[in-house]
Regions:
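Substrate-binding pocket helix/loop in short-chain dehydrogenase/reductase
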Residues: 102-103, 107-115
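The beta1-alpha1 cofactor-binding region of Rossmann-like NAD(H)/NADP(H)-dependent oxidoreductases
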Residues: 44-45, 65-76, 108
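SDR active-site lid
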Residues: 179-244
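Residue(s) in the substrate-gating loop at a strand-loop-helix junction
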Residues: 146
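Active-site helix of classical SDR
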Residues: 126, 162
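Active-site-adjacent segment of SDR/Rossmann-fold oxidoreductases
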Residues: 26, 33, 151, 172-183
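Conserved glycine-rich cofactor-binding loop
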Residues: 19-20
């Protein structure tokens, strides 16, 4: 466990998956607001880089290696936050991995890997910090999901299911925790410019190539998503949809889902033609 920067008296913020991508940008966004940060990841080098960037931005942080599949490591992170901060104001369950492949090509191990990190990792994160939040009677949980929870693109069924589960979990927590003074938000970005594919796990390369094209063509970056997440969660918005195209697609699905399904049929047919 290491710490850097000058400690402030701002919000106490925990971020999993803080070693790169959106997690890093969230750390920098909160650092600019004077937050005290607990940064967690399995990427030790990435954590070190994020910690230095936070310090350069005038923020204070400590880091702790944490695999979100291991509840004992998350519980240890919560204990460190209690010892160093005396509590937690914002918990951001951000750690996640990319995956893809047609359903018949995905193994049960592929499903276990994806669900274990992207869904159960969020469940365990919430569970590990819940005693602190309940004892405080306040705080905020921000779970990072995806537009894949709402618009299920072919060739990534296990990812779609995991992210849909995060949305369902977040809606459940929203209802259960609101009377107790604990706020909940869920963030559902479309693909954006980040290094998500570094964690790609799947049986074929076509899905990875398709994802790479979507990432490269995104009009917004991880820093943009982090800024939107900060602003909208502070405004107590529950469902945060950073991409305009994602918002429009969801509106279309609600109005006439068959239109979206027809687009998904075309995508699946194109994917099968590509092999």
């Amino acid at each position: 466990m290491e710490s850097t920067g000058m400690q402030s008296t701002g919000q106490r913020v925990v971020i999993t998956g803080a070693g790169s991508g959106l997690g890093r940008e969230l750390a920098l966004r909160y650092a600019r607001e004077g937050a005290r940060l607990a940064l967690a990841d399995i990427n030790d080098d990435g954590l070190k880089e994020t910690r230095q960037l936070v310090a350069d931005a005038g923020g204070w942080s400590f880091s702790q290696r944490c695999d979100v599949r291991d509840f004992s490591q998350l519980a240890a992170l919560a204990q460190s936050c209690e010892e160093r901060f005396g509590g937690v104001d914002v918990l951001i369950n951000n750690a996640g991995v990319a995956s893809g492949g047609m359903f018949w090509d995905l193994s049960l191990e592929d499903w276990d890997f994806q669900i274990g990190i992207n869904l159960i990792g969020v469940v365990k994160g919430c569970k590990a910090f819940m005693p602190l939040l309940l004892a405080q009677g306040n705080g905020r949980i921000i779970n990072i999901a995806s537009m894949a929870a709402h618009i299920q693109t072919p060739g990534m069924s296990n990812y779609n299911v995991a992210k849909a589960g995060v949305v369902a979990l977040s809606e459940s927590l929203l209802a259960e925790l609101q009377p107790l003074g604990i706020k909940v938000s869920v963030v559902c970005p479309s693909f954006f410019q980040t290094n998500l594919l570094d964690s790609y796990h799947g049986p074929d390369h076509q899905s990875k190539n398709d994802m790479a094209k979507l990432l490269e063509s995104s009009p917004i970056s991880a820093a943009d998503v982090a800024d939107i997440t900060y602003r909208e969660s502070e405004a107590d918005h529950f469902m945060i949809l950073p991409h305009e195209r994602g918002r429009l697609a969801l509106e279309q699905k609600r109005a006439d889902p068959q239109v979206i399904y027809q687009e998904m049929f075309k995508l699946a047919a194109r994917r099968l033609q590509q092999g």
